[in-house]
């Protein structure tokens, strides 16, 4: 490990001397792109992060928002584990789950749900399938073992991820105000206590590793930078954390993630504008002869750092012992520098704020992305429908989510496969449901980063609206390639601006998130990928699902769209086009339609456009007969719109302030019949299911 020349000069100026080897390694990791957001920090001010519901916004391990009408607080956070999941898809993905769950614990919350947004290279690529298989197994094994359901997410395939997949995981938790904890250290003299797994050498330099392009030999050369998870210890840590909170033993908390103990402990005291004195020899270790740098920076999993009052240390140790967890009193909070001692010598002595917040921002050159030309194909209607329904990006994700236990915890009331997940808030005792949507479409942002990111916000809000829910807050995972490339950084800038404007348009604060850059490899950079996780709520009003009842008229709330840019239609059949302008006004209209008593089914427009939305609504017992004005109207993926089956189309049209277009009617024959101009194509439910079963068919 080594600091760059300019950073080393800054460190020498701050310390008044050359750094020790341990200090240099600590600064390199904490000042890395992964930890310090050096290339993106200046862009993040574009996001609005305040609302009446926000209790804790950006800067902590997870954000906290209040659920209106209840005494419950919801925590939400999102993290990336991209590079590790390429090197070791199973452990990389599993430890990504573990890390975001511990972020939830750090706030005093109990984790109730996970969502995963996964991005891989072309589905036809054998290595992409290998990565998909390993990532899903890792998430499944870890999430199932700790008893937290994975209830929402998305899986996307795009050639930009061939050499660098993305694994973005969000977690939602519950807490009440009296149990809320933050990471900021509070009082000099309090003890710092490390609870959980013993520290080994795994994950060394993980933060630095995540701040570089993936090399061609990364799967072997970078294996030591990938952590190894133990979900059974994580489950014990979850329950121990609850017990510590029950007994009011926690003053502040932070999980050990990027940069390990050095990152967690220095950030805790920096947030409290305090210092610390830490004895590294006191850390419980599982490997012999570890040196100071290894103890400081190892990213061994399932560990928490707590600030504890001196009088409560024995009680904390007793709780750890009860749950068969290691426990070390490693130091105390001070008013001075952040100091670490090892083998009787001082190996780190630096201001905590310089370590945690002193990395200078990097000004990156950028070029403005250019809009694509319009060059649309003109296939036969049947050819187009079959091609789009058979595409991996419109395929059923059942193969993925059936591996997850989405029922554990007895809260799940809207399951994977619907527009958004729904989780019963039993504590509110009034039927309130927490809703969750997560994901992004790289085809949209590869086409036009600003418009595609804006649409990502509208799409996730529409998912909630189709479930009758109103958004409370969002967290983002901003994934990009090498920021030193002006074209890449220009796309990243446009993506951030578009997502910020889109979240403003849906009136949803962005309360936290994660930036992951240097997602670049020998095959090139990824598409700018703005994963968004939106948490919302719904009162006791029931809403229908997406399956047709076969007993109503079909209308399109939000009207037809024309642009085909970023669509599966163009991916499957060739051509280019501009991305359609999403209208956030449709979100409220979809929500109103979903909660009406005369609504029988509702499903939003997304991947594959109107054609796929209708196909997904068809069941063996209910079908649809519709007329659409053209191929663009059938396949445009412009969000903020939904198909609604209603008993009273006239009343619905009169009630909404957005265009409502009559499409046709639901039937009881289990077939989809689509007419465009003078051409009609019919596909039955079995054929649709076969088309959309490509992932399961190829991987089972």
Swiss-Prot record:
A UniProt-annotated Pfam family: FGAR-AT_linker
GO annotation, cellular component aspect: cytoplasm
Top-level taxon of the source organism: Archaea
Recorded metabolic or biological pathway in which this protein acts: Purine metabolism; IMP biosynthesis via de novo pathway; 5-amino-1-(5-phospho-D-ribosyl)imidazole from N(2)-formyl-N(1)-(5-phospho-D-ribosyl)glycinamide: step 1/2
GO biological process: 'de novo' IMP biosynthetic process; purine nucleotide biosynthetic process
Residues reported to bind ATP: 37, 476, 513
Residues involved in Mg(2+) 2 binding: 103, 255
Cleaved signal peptide residues: none
GO MF annotations in UniProt: ATP binding; magnesium ion binding; phosphoribosylformylglycinamidine synthase activity
Family: Belongs to the FGAMS family.
Protein name: Phosphoribosylformylglycinamidine synthase subunit PurL
Record organism: Halobacterium salinarum (strain ATCC 700922 / JCM 11081 / NRC-1)
Gene label: purL
